UniProtKB/Swiss-Prot annotation:
Polar residues bias locations: 46-62
One CC-aspect GO term: cytoplasm
UniProt source species: Aspergillus clavatus (strain ATCC 1007 / CBS 513.65 / DSM 816 / NCTC 3887 / NRRL 1 / QM 1276 / 107)
Gene Ontology molecular function, alphabetical: cysteine-type endopeptidase activity
UniProt keywords, alphabetically: Apoptosis, Hydrolase, Protease, Thiol protease, Zymogen
Recorded superkingdom: Eukaryota
Disordered: annotated span: 1-68
Highest classification ranks of the organism: Eukaryota, Fungi, Dikarya, Ascomycota, Pezizomycotina
BP terms from Gene Ontology: apoptotic process; proteolysis
Primary gene name: casA
Protein name: Metacaspase-1A
Length: 429
């Protein structure tokens, strides 16, 4: 197991003022019960499933401007200033997804219409960006492992800093945040495996298009041999609850099953992992560099019967069947190249899932001693970059985060997504 925080803990804290009670009131499963491990389906709200959310208007810009829009592989969308504001789309032989200022107002907002996955995906398999104008919920986990071998110093600070930032700058209400840290007296607020899994279910329950969900983990991360054959490096990424010695770790496949697969189109889940081996902690298949260059699955090559079953369930609006089909398909997969090539397709999502991770899978996360507090380097850099400029595109923000880290660290955070991402769009949350 890797360690990623050193230094002195500069915050103390007894969890005062954090919404343990609000969480229990909203918890659909009831604290103290076993978290539901079987038959976890998606919200049963299918009306208008394939329709864009109401009030989801066109981007309101003035003047002519161009911005990159990935659609069906290599395309560029050109905004034409005209009375009826039509869009014209031109095919290009090659599209370089580097940022150029589209207009004086900054990067354009996400599009309102569903977007095709492209790259060989079956027809009708679309995803939907979220405009993050709906309900906000956040789950934040910080574990210092007090009294254990490998005790950390900064993880609770990470959670307190992030929760304050989200509350003051992004409209996340305290009563809609759940903080699990191992300095709290309430046993339901301890970051045990059972509490973490239960809180993950709470986070995504009843999420609607344009809602904005936020997940933050700061603690030990590691790798374990991959039993499904779906990881390129042969290892699953894991996180370690405070009681991992008794209850065990939580594998990336399980986090993906709980927090990504049930989400409807247009729901945003933003995840930040400040831990070792967190580069693919949510098993998201699309990965971006600072130039916006994309690592993506070839859906044409990999669209086997398993994916088609998932897509047909998706087209019917049958999210429960989609989840069970995907999980069953993963369990049936054989080890080796075939398993990896086939299963990463089921890790796509019609929702809008974005992950900022503090290290690539092959790296070990670093720590920082910032303003007298031991703090996770990724958490600190994310907040610092957005404070300096809240109006950035995805690729600008990724570069800004790396610039923040470059003064002290060799760590290179990465941006992962559940769908093809136009990294020139405005980052919203």
């Amino acid at each position: 197991m890797q360690h990623h925080h050193q230094g002195s803990y500069g915050g103390g804290g007894g969890g005062g003022g954090y919404p343990g009670q609000a969480y229990r009131e909203q918890n659909p499963y009831g604290y103290g019960q076993q978290s539901p491990q079987q038959g976890y389906g998606a919200p049963q709200q299918h009306n208008g499933y394939n329709q864009p959310p109401s009030g989801y208007g066109q981007p309101q810009h003035n003047g002519g401007q161009m911005y990159g829009q990935r659609q069906q592989g290599m395309w560029l969308r050109v905004r034409i200033a005209s009375r009826d504001r039509k869009f014209l789309t031109f095919a290009l032989g090659q599209y370089q997804n580097h940022y150029s200022h589209p207009h004086q107002g900054g990067p354009p907002p996400p599009p309102s219409e569903p977007v095709a996955f492209g790259h060989g995906a079956p027809q009708g398999y679309n995803f939907q960006y979220s405009r993050c104008t709906g309900k906000r919920k956040a789950l934040m986990i910080g574990i210092n492992y007090f009294g254990q071998k490998g005790q950390l110093r900064g993880c609770i600070n990470d959670v307190k800093n992030m929760s304050t930032y989200l509350n003051q700058n992004f409209g996340y209400a305290r009563e809609d945040m759940v903080l699990l840290t191992d300095d709290q007296q309430n046993p339901m607020s301890q970051p045990t495996k059972a509490n973490i899994l239960r809180a993950m279910h709470w986070l995504v329950k009843d999420a609607q298009p344009n809602d904005s969900l936020f997940f933050h983990y700061s603690g030990h991360g590691g790798q374990t041999p991959d039993l499904d054959g779906d990881e390129e490096d042969g290892y699953d990424e894991v996180i370690y609850p405070v009681d991992f010695r008794q209850a065990g770790h939580i594998v990336d496949d399980e986090m993906h099953r709980i927090m990504v697969q049930p989400l409807r189109p247009g729901v945003r889940l933003t995840a930040i992992f400040d831990s070792c081996h967190s580069g693919s902690a949510l098993d998201l298949p699309y990965i971006y560099s600072t130039q916006g260059i994309l690592k993506e699955p070839n859906l044409a090559k990999e669209a086997g019967q398993g994916l088609l079953g998932v897509v047909s369930a998706y087209a019917r609006g049958d999210m429960g069947s989609m989840v069970s089909t995907a999980v069953g398909f993963l369990k049936r997969a054989a080890k080796g190249d075939e398993a990896y090539e086939r299963t990463k397709q089921t890790k796509t999502s019609p929702a809008d899932v974005i992950m900022w991770s503090g290290s690539k899978d092959s790296q070990t996360s670093q720590d920082a001693q910032i303003a007298g507090q031991a703090t996770g380097a990724m958490s600190w850099a994310f907040i610092s970059a957005l404070r300096k400029n809240p109006q950035q595109s995805y690729v600008q923000l990724l570069n800004s985060i790396r610039d923040e880290l470059a003064t002290k660290y060799t760590q290179k955070p990465q941006l992962s997504c559940s769908h093809p991402l136009d990294t020139n769009l405005l980052y919203v949350m």
